[in-house]
């Protein structure tokens, strides 16, 4: 049985925590930043966890990470 390929796009966007949960970065941080408040941009810098409903699908994309 061959190994499962890692989805390289997902590998660059997600990483697993020590307890096995999946971390992600928030969106809306790359452009059109002048109209966003400093507080909003600061809060967008903080990473967050993937929703429980999406966790299984993302785990399949990054099996060895």
Swiss-Prot record:
Spans through the membrane: none
Covalent S-S links between cysteines: none
Comp. bias (Basic residues): 10-26
One Pfam family cited in the UniProt record for this chain: Ribosomal_L35p
Chain spans, region Disordered: 1-28
One example of a Gene Ontology biological process annotation: translation
A GO cellular component entry from the record: cytosolic large ribosomal subunit
Record flagged with keyword Cell membrane: no
Keywords per UniProt: Ribonucleoprotein, Ribosomal protein
InterPro entries per record: Ribosomal_bL35, Ribosomal_bL35-like, Ribosomal_bL35_CS, Ribosomal_bL35_sf
GO MF assignments: structural constituent of ribosome
HAMAP family listed in its UniProt record: Ribosomal_bL35
Homology family: Belongs to the bacterial ribosomal protein bL35 family.
Name of the protein in its database record: Large ribosomal subunit protein bL35
Organism of provenance: Syntrophotalea carbinolica (strain DSM 2380 / NBRC 103641 / GraBd1)
């Amino acid at each position: 049985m061959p190994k499962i390929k890692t989805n390289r796009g997902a590998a660059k966007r997600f990483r697993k925590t020590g307890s096995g949960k999946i971390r992600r970065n928030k969106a809306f941080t790359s452009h059109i930043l002048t109209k966003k408040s400093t507080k909003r941009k600061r809060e967008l810098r903080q990473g967050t966890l993937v929703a429980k409903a999406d966790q299984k699908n993302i785990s399949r994309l990054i099996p060895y990470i």
